[in-house]
C-alpha cells in the first residue's frame, strides 16, 4: 500500500491505482464525454476489488513510501512484492543492500478478461519556438545524442549505476538489441533488470483518459481509499462515495484529446 506522510498519519495516494491497477483492469473514472462512471464501472470494481482482497487477506504492508520505515521493512524481509514502476530500482539499490540478490522482476499481473499489463508512462520535452531562442538547436542536438548515441548512453548509465542513481532505457529499439541492455544484475540474482524493463512495457494497457480535473479527482478518490483502509467503510461503500463526491464536487470533466 503506497502512502505519504501527513503529520504522522499516512495518506493514501491514488497515483499508483491510476497508473497501475486501474488501467490494467480497464477501469474508468470518466466516460468519453467526461461524465463520472466510476461507481458503475466494472473495471473499477476489478481493480479496487483486487486491492480489497489483498488487504482483507493481510497481504499489504501499510507504511510510507520512500521513507526509512519502508526500507527497514524491506531489509528485514517483510516485503515480498512491489507493484511499481522501474524507477523504484534506484531506491532499492540505494537503501536495501541487505536484500541484494533476492529480487526478481516480472511484468504486471494481468486481470482475467482484460489481459493487459500495466500502463506505460512517458516523459516529454518541448521547445517553444517563440522569438529568439539561441539554444533550441543545441537542445535538439543534445537530446538526439543522448537518445541515439549508444556509446555515450552506455557510459552515462555506468556512471549512474556507480552512484546508485536513476537512469532510463533508451527509446530506440535498435539500441535495446545491444548486449549492454541485456546485462545481468547482481541485485536481481543475475536477471537482467534492463532487459526486463523493456519486456515489461509489452502488451501495456491504455492509460486512463486525461482531464484538467485529475488532481482534484485524485484527492477525492484517495480520501475514500483512506477511509476504507482505516476500516471506516467497505470497498463497495468507498467506490459509491467516490462516485457521489466526484459528481458533487466536479461534475463533468473536460476530456483532453
Language model region names:
Residues 67, 84-90, 121-123:
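Beta->alpha turn/N-cap motifs
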Residues 92-99, 113-121, 125-219:
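C-terminal lobe and pocket-closing loops
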Residues 1-36, 43, 79:
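Extracytoplasmic/periplasmic solute-binding protein
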Residues 76-85:
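Alpha-to-beta junction loops
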Residues 33-64:
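Glycine-centered hinge/linker elements that transmit conformational signals in sensory
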Residues 101-112:
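A structural supersecondary motif
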Residues 62-76:
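Short helix-initiation/N-cap motifs at beta->coil->alpha
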Residues 1-11, 148-161, 248-257:
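Bilobed periplasmic-binding protein-like "clamshell/Venus-flytrap" ligand-binding domains
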Amino acid at each position: 500500500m503506497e502512502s505519504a506522510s501527513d503529520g504522522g498519519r499516512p495518506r493514501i495516494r491514488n497515483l499508483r491505482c491510476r497508473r497501475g491497477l486501474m488501467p490494467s483492469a480497464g477501469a474508468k473514472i470518466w466516460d468519453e464525454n467526461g461524465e463520472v462512471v466510476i461507481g458503475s464501472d466494472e473495471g473499477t470494481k476489478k481493480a479496487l476489488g483486487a486491492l480489497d482482497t489483498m488487504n482483507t487477506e493481510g497481504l499489504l504492508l501499510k507504511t510510507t513510501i520512500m521513507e526509512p520505515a519502508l526500507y527497514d521493512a524491506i531489509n528485514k524481509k517483510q516485503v515480498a512484492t512491489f507493484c511499481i514502476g522501474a524507477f523504484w530500482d534506484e531506491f532499492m539499490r540505494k537503501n536495501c543492500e541487505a536484500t541484494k540478490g533476492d529480487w526478481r522482476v516480472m511484468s504486471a499481473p494481468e486481470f482475467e478478461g482484460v489481459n493487459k499489463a500495466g500502463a506505460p508512462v512517458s516523459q516529454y520535452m518541448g521547445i517553444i519556438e517563440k522569438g529568439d531562442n539561441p539554444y533550441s538547436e543545441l537542445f535538439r542536438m543534445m537530446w538526439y545524442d543522448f537518445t541515439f548515441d549508444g556509446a555515450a548512453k552506455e557510459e552515462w548509465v555506468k556512471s549512474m549505476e556507480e552512484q546508485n542513481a536513476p537512469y532510463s532505457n533508451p527509446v530506440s529499439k535498435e539500441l535495446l538489441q545491444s548486449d549492454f541492455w541485456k546485462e545481468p544484475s547482481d541485485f536481481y540474482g543475475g536477471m537482467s533488470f534492463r532487459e526486463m524493463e523493456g519486456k515489461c512495457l509489452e502488451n501495456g494497457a491504455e492509460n486512463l483518459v486525461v482531464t484538467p480535473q485529475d488532481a482534484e479527482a485524485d484527492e477525492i478518490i484517495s480520501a475514500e481509499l483512506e477511509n476504507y483502509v482505516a476500516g471506516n467503510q467497505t470497498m463497495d461503500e468507498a467506490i459509491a462515495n467516490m462516485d457521489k463526491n466526484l459528481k458533487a464536487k466536479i461534475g463533468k470533466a473536460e476530456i483532453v484529446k
